[in-house]
Amino acid sequence: MSRSLKKGPFVADHLLKKIEKLNIKGIQKVIVTWSRSSTIVPIMIGHTVAVHNGREHIPVFITDKMVGHKLGEFALTRTFKTHTKKVNKKTKR
């Protein structure tokens, strides 16, 4: 279920303030955040946000195609190890 339009997208206040400061100064700097549930809004385009995945911060460069998605979608929390292949062992008789 999507969020109500009258509420608008959720963006953490501290994250929004940091991005607005950097936009005013014109500085490109990595912004560290734990807020995986924040929605990407158009003022974030061109910034790099380091999103916490539970163990470390993953740098995510924001492009225009990412607008409307959540930050957590781009910092995967689980590492997939490939399944082991079946080895047919033929025994000699």
From Swiss-Prot:
Subcellular location: Plastid, Chloroplast
InterPro entries tied to this protein: Ribosomal_uS19, Ribosomal_uS19_bac-type, Ribosomal_uS19_CS, Ribosomal_uS19_SF
Listed GO biological process terms: ribosomal small subunit assembly; translation
Principal subcellular localization: plastid
Gene Ontology MF term list: rRNA binding; structural constituent of ribosome
Keyword annotations of the record: Chloroplast, Plastid, Ribonucleoprotein, Ribosomal protein, RNA-binding, rRNA-binding
Keyword Ribosomal protein among record annotations: yes
One Gene Ontology term, aspect cellular component: mitochondrial small ribosomal subunit
Protein task: Protein S19 forms a complex with S13 that binds strongly to the 16S ribosomal RNA.
Family from the record: Belongs to the universal ribosomal protein uS19 family.
Protein name from the UniProt record: Small ribosomal subunit protein uS19c
Native organism: Stigeoclonium helveticum (Green alga)
Gene: rps19
